Every structure is written in C-alpha cells, then in structure tokens.
Amino acid sequence: MLVKADMTKDIAQVMAEVGRKAKAAAAPLSIATSEQKNKALNAAADAILEARADILEANRLDLANAEKNGMAASFVDRLTLNEARIDAIAEDIRAIATLPDPVGEVIAEWDRPNGLHIERVRTPLGVIGVIYESRPNVTADAGALCLKAGNAVILRGGSDSAHSSAAIHKALVKGLEAANLPADAIQIVPVTDRAAVGEMLKGLGGAIDVIVPRGGKSLVARVQSEARVPVFAHLEGICHLYIDKSADLDMARRIALDAKMRRTGICGAAETLLVDRAVASTHLAPILGDLAAGGCEIRGSAEVLALYPAAKPATEEDWSTEYLDAIISVALVDGISGAIDHINRYSSHHTEAIVAEDAQTVARFFNEIDSAILLHNASTQFADGGEFGMGAEIGIATGKMHARGPVGVEQLTSFKYRVRGSGQVRG
C-alpha cells in the first residue's frame, strides 16, 4: 500500500523498517531450494494472469494521471500495459523459473600442492535496492530475477506507475506465500516521496548491499553521486548503427528500420546512424526513405542534408541525445576508422551495431569500441536479457565493475571460496 508524504511516521523510520524486513528475509531466501524459488515464480506468474483485470484497472489510473500531466508519448508507451504485455510479463517470470539456479554453482575449482582443494561458489548478494522510472514491467522482472538469485529486493518505481507496480507486487507476494518463502523478500517502497530514494542511497543502515538504478541520465547521476553502497549503473542508451561500405544494402535497410522503429522508447533503440561515406550515394537515400516512411524524423549533418534534403539539420547536442522517440541523427563517416572515432566520442557505452561483410572491418569494430554490447549484422534491439537467454534483465550495466551488459540472475550473485583440507597448517 502506498502512503502519502504527510504520513504520521517519519520517512526515515518507514524506510529503516523496510530495510530491516528485507535483511531478515534475505537470510532464509539465501538458502531456499531451487524448487521453492521456482514454485514461487510460477505461482507469481499465475497470480499476475489471475489479477489481469485489477492490473489493467490500476494501469488505467496511472495512464489517466500521465495524460493529465502531459507526459510524452514515449513515456506513456513505457507506462502502458495491455493484455499482450501482461501475458509477456507472466511468460518472462516463467522463463526465469526455467533458468539454472546460480546459487551454489561451483564456477572454478583447483587443487594446491599442499593438498587444499579450493572452490569458488556463487552466492546471493543479499539485499538489492532497485530504483527505476515508470515502467511497470520492471517491478515484475526485478522482483523475479532477484528471487531466482536468492536475493531480497526493495523496489522503488516512479510515482507515475505507482498503481500498476503495486498491483503487480501484490501478485509477486502471492507467489512467495505459495512457496512458504518470506513475503518481505520482495518489498515495494510504501511511500511516493522522493526522500525515500535518498534513504535507500544511504543503504538503510547497512541493509542494502547494492543499488541498481534503471532510468534516465538524471536518475543515474543522482544515484552515482549520492549512493553509499555499490551501484550497478544503467546509463542511457545512445546506441549507434554503422553501415559499412561492405554491407549488404537490403540487410542494412532491414536492420536500420528495426533498430530504430521496432520500439523507439527502449534503451536498445538506435539513436544515431552512421553511413560509410564511400557508399553514401547508393545506401543513404534508401535507408532514410524507409525510416521516414515509418514515421521517423531524420536529423542529419550538412553532408546528409545535401544527399537527403528532407532531413532536418542536426545540432551538436543531437549526437549525444537519447531520443526514446521516432527521431534519429545521421552522419557520414570515413569508413570504420571514422565510425570508431564518432562512437567512442559520443557513445554512452551501451550498445553499438555494425552492418558489414568484411571480416577485418568487423574485427576492428569489436576490438576498438568499448561498449557493453556490440552486434554484427543484427539490430541493436537485441540488447536485451531475454534475447540473450537470460530470461529477463534487471537492467543493462554500462560500467565495468562486477556486472556489464544485461544484468540477469548470474550477475545478481557474488561468490565465496570453500577450502577443503585434511589437517593442513601453515606452520
């Protein structure tokens, strides 16, 4: 249940209690069997489908508020739930249940000359705090992934999706209860006041082990600057698609249209198109024509405008903008070297793709660009944990510590060492 900011209890006290409950739930959850966790996940998926009408009604309240507040179309798209999206949420939870349990997996082992046998074993992180914007599906994905990895989780979604997230959370709790797991293993922050985020970033008195922010630049920047606990940063997706002179034009057209227009409001949508200057006269117009016919606004450099006058002039700001909308910035570059220079200058290190047939060109793209996900002859919209076979993702980490790329169940674990001896002493 969500509480307004003028509640009788102080927000710090409320959040401290949330942290205490999460910490208490984390201990039994860390040793829960795979069967228990999978039972909880499948029961949660059932509960979501059974509560379909309630979830849709809650979502209608959120959508009405978003319309009243004049939110952008891309924002409303991410907020919107329908029959198909609810089915997809349930399917994603079931897919997570089918994944191998990472907890207890021996990821390396070796013997020492003195007879000690050493094992590196996956363990839960503990309590994860997830702070995200108004995407109701993240409530389900994050809750399910953390559960599978044996972690308790505290979910703080955007206030604009409060009703939808609360309805989904209710179904997740039913899943926990069906498997006799602690209901506090998946909690939703019970207040909409932003001060609750500040309390989470302080760590709730040592209760939170890691924070995962999922949202725009301002949210992630705040988390990174204020957090007193480790952070898995999910930065904006300024994703690039480069069309090399060796590319198959038909393939390039299909990929460009999908990378930008399949869903414009997701972090894996292409925001900048780079075309090899050597094939601009033959490749640029067909590709941009497809995008324009699909309703995409083209913003191009002066060279692009000369070849495709229907484009609008691009500004310097465009090259570092995540549109999350039917807009794309377009530039011509001097082959793979020019593409690498442009991407390394403007990228958020999320996802980049190349369409090319030349193996050496592809090798340079893979070796010289330092982004979390690099694709060859495939759409940037495959930058997704589900598409990677992870079941779902809690976000796409763009940093370099611990987790990078799609954050699935394995990335939500740590490890410990088990050392077996037969009486050895160092002496």
From Swiss-Prot:
Instruction: Write out the GO biological process terms.
Output: L-proline biosynthetic process
Organism ancestry: Bacteria, Pseudomonadati, Pseudomonadota, Alphaproteobacteria, Hyphomicrobiales
Reactions catalysed according to its record = L-glutamate 5-semialdehyde + phosphate + NADP(+) = L-glutamyl 5-phosphate + NADPH + H(+)
- The UniProt record lists the EC number as 1.2.1.41
Q: Give, as in the UniProt entry, the pathway in which the protein acts.
A: Amino-acid biosynthesis; L-proline biosynthesis; L-glutamate 5-semialdehyde from L-glutamate: step 2/2
Family to which this protein belongs: Belongs to the gamma-glutamyl phosphate reductase family.
Q: What does this protein do?
A: Catalyzes the NADPH-dependent reduction of L-glutamate 5-phosphate into L-glutamate 5-semialdehyde and phosphate. The product spontaneously undergoes cyclization to form 1-pyrroline-5-carboxylate.
User: What is this protein's record name?
Assistant: Gamma-glutamyl phosphate reductase
Q: What GO MF terms are annotated?
A: glutamate-5-semialdehyde dehydrogenase activity; NADP binding
Localization per Swiss-Prot or TrEMBL: Cytoplasm
Name the encoding gene, please. proA
Q: What class of enzyme is it?
A: oxidoreductase
User: What's the chief localization of this chain?
Assistant: cytoplasm
One Pfam family, short name: Aldedh
Q: Which organism is it from?
A: Brucella canis (strain ATCC 23365 / NCTC 10854 / RM-666)
Q: Which keywords does this Swiss-Prot/TrEMBL entry list?
A: Amino-acid biosynthesis, Cytoplasm, NADP, Oxidoreductase, Proline biosynthesis
Q: Which InterPro entries match?
A: Ald_DH/histidinol_DH (IPR016161), Ald_DH_C (IPR016163), Ald_DH_N (IPR016162), Aldehyde_DH_dom (IPR015590), G-glutamylP_reductase_CS (IPR020593), Glu-5-SA_DH (IPR012134), GPR_dom (IPR000965)
